Structures are given as structure tokens and as C-alpha cells.
Amino acid sequence: MSIALKQVFNKDKTFRPKRKFEPGTQRFELHKRAQASLNSGVDLKAAVQLPSGEDQNDWVAVHVVDFFNRINLIYGTICEFCTERTCPVMSGGPKYEYRWQDDLKYKKPTALPAPQYMNLLMDWIEVQINNEDIFPTCVGVPFPKNFLQICKKILCRLFRVFVHVYIHHFDRVIVMGAEAHVNTCYKHFYYFVTEMNLIDRKELEPLKEMTSRMCH
């Protein structure tokens, strides 16, 4: 990453604190392998494939945490331009509106301003990935039976952040010189969720044209 991009994606801009893996553990090694996929020249399509002999849940877990860290960093770089005035409803253009629902305050799908939606989303994901019953950090502790379903929901909602950033705020990304980095993050995300079949194709529709040009 260039010096300019490092300044754009600095730790002060992180929307949420990073969740990390313990050095020396199997998941830390998988995390390093996943991280290496952002190095220039790496074949992202090949990099996301489950390594031989590795557990699928471990592979998905390290990627979900990694994508959460990266995407909240991307949103953090433009969040000052994403306000209740500029984005009164969380959307991806005129055709796609995303409503928030959880098991707490919002029992029914509710239209919210984009920044409020993003805050609720990042809070919700943080709770999931910091829950030892869902994302166990101790080696040998099994993942729950519904682990992949939870991950699918997390990734589906993270994809909506990409949709909103690309459609409503990509001009700011370009001004900051971060276009190449964001595009690489998106390609990595797209190749992973399609390789592992973690997002319904209908959810990917808002960026379909862009994706067809970017991800061959």
C-alpha cells in the first residue's frame, strides 16, 4: 500500500476497534494467509479457496473478522460525508433500500438514516464476533451448528456497506486516492462469498454491472 493510502487508512479512521487472533494459533496462521491475499500480484480468485486439509469454519471465521475490520475501515474514511442529511435512508441508489431489524429495539424492518444503520450494523457484528459461543478463540472449542448461517447474515449486511459506499460515496474514495485499495477489498470479498456460497445471488444484484467488469 502506498504512503498516501496508509495515511487514508490509518488507525484513527477505524470505525470500530479491530478484533485480532492470538499469535501461535491455527486461526492466526489462517488469518495471515488470508491477509497475504491483498499483496499485489496475488490471484484473489485462487487465494480464497479453502486450503487443503483446513476446516471450513475456521477459514470462514478468519475471513469474516478480516472483512469486518477492512470494511469498517473503508466506511470510517467516508463516514464524515455520510450524514442524516446526505443519506436520510440507508440505500444503494433508488432501487435498493435497506431496513434494519434486530432482536432488540427494531423488531420489524425499519427505514433508518445510513449513519444510524451503519452504527447499528457495526455494533451488531461486534457482538457476534466477540461472542465466544459463536466465534470461539480457544483451539478445540467447536463452532455452533448455526455458525455458517450467522456468517451469511454478517456478510450479507457487510455487502450493503460496499453498495452504499460505491453508489453514494465513491467520489470521496477517489478524491482520497483510495479507489484501488477499496476495489481490491471488494474483489477479495466478492470472490470469497461466491467461492464459499455465503451470499444469495439476489443480494449481489445492486453491484452486478460493476462486478462483471471488475471480477472476471
UniProtKB/Swiss-Prot annotation:
Keyword Iron-sulfur attributed: no
Gene Ontology BP terms? regulation of hippo signaling; signal transduction
Report the domain of life of the source organism.
Eukaryota
- Report keywords, A-Z: Metal-binding, Zinc
Concerning InterPro entries, the annotation shows: MOB_kinase_act_fam (IPR005301), MOB_kinase_act_sf (IPR036703)
Binding of Zn(2+) occurs at C82, C87, H164, H169
> What's a single GO MF annotation on this record?
protein kinase activator activity
For this record, the Gene Ontology CC terms, alphabetical, are: cytoplasm; nucleus
Family, per entry = Belongs to the MOB1/phocein family.
Question: Matching PANTHER family, A to Z?
Answer: MPS ONE BINDER KINASE ACTIVATOR-LIKE MOB
Q: Give a short account of what the protein does.
A: Modulates LATS1 expression in the Hippo signaling pathway which plays a pivotal role in organ size control and tumor suppression by restricting proliferation and promoting apoptosis.
Protein name in UniProt: MOB kinase activator 3B
Record organism: Bos taurus
Q: Gene encoding this polypeptide?
A: MOB3B
